[in-house]
C-alpha cells in the first residue's frame, strides 16, 4: 500500500507537552479508540507517555463498527489484561459501564486515600485519543451539558479543560494527538478514511480507491445494496466508482465521471455509518 502521511501541527506538539505535565496530576487514563480501527487509533506515542498509569480502554463508535469484530477486539484487550468497554458517546450507550470501570481501576488509589484520611476527593481522569474519536462528546454526555466544544472534524478541541461532574469524577479533555510519522501506511489509511486526519494532507482519491477495494472484498454486499450496483470482487475499482457515479448522479455534462463528488459521497457515507457497519482493523491473537 502506497499511502504516506506526515501530519503534526504545532498545537499538537504543545498538547503533547501539556499532557506529559497533566499526567502527573491524574489518577486514571481513558484511552478512547475508534471501534472501526482499534489498532490504528491507538497512539504509540501516548502509550509510551502513559507508562504504568492505570488505564481503561473505551471503544467508541460501536454503532458504526462490525459487531462481531467488536466483540473479538474486546476479547483481545481482555486477554491482554486491559480493562475495556464499548461505548457509543452519541447515544450514551455503555457510558455507565465505562464509569464503573474507571472507578474499579482507581480502587487502589481511593483505598490509599481512605487510609490517609482523605475523603470527598474526586478521581481525576484524563481522556486521550486521536482527533475526532469522540472525547469531547463523551464529556458532554457525562456532564449532561455542552460544556466542551465538540464537532465532527479533527482538530476542534485545542485547549485542555477540566470538567467536574457529580459522580465523583474530575475529567480532563485533551486535544486529539497524532504522531509525526506513520511507519505502517495501513495506519495512515485507516486514520484518513475515518476522519482523524485533515483531508488536505493526503490524496483523497487514493484513499477512496483503497477503501472501496477493501470493502469490495470484506463487505461486498453492503456496497451492492447501498448503491444499488453490481460488481465482481475482481472488478477494477475505477469501474465500481463509475457505477456509483451513475447510480447516484455524480456525473458532469456529457456523462463524465465527477470524481470529486464520488469521493465526497463515499467518505461521507462511510464516516457516518450510512454505508454499513465496518471494521477495517482485523482482530488477531498478535494484536
Regions found by a protein language model. Name each.
Residues 1-28, 36-37, 42-45, 49-55, ...:
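Helix-rich effector regions associated with P-loop NTPase G domains
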Residues 44-47, 71-74, 99-101, 140-142, ...:
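Short, glycine/charged-enriched secondary-structure capping and boundary segments
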Residues 56, 62-129, 147, 248-251:
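Canonical P-loop GTPase G-domain recognition
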Residues 89, 139, 169-172:
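Conserved active-site beta-strand-loop modules that form the wall/rim of enzyme catalytic pockets
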Residues 97, 101, 137, 210, ...:
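Alpha-helical scaffold segments in soluble metabolic enzymes
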Residues 102, 106-110, 131, 142-146, ...:
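Short, well-ordered alpha-helical segments in soluble proteins
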Residues 124-144, 148, 174:
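Glycine-rich phosphate-binding P-loop
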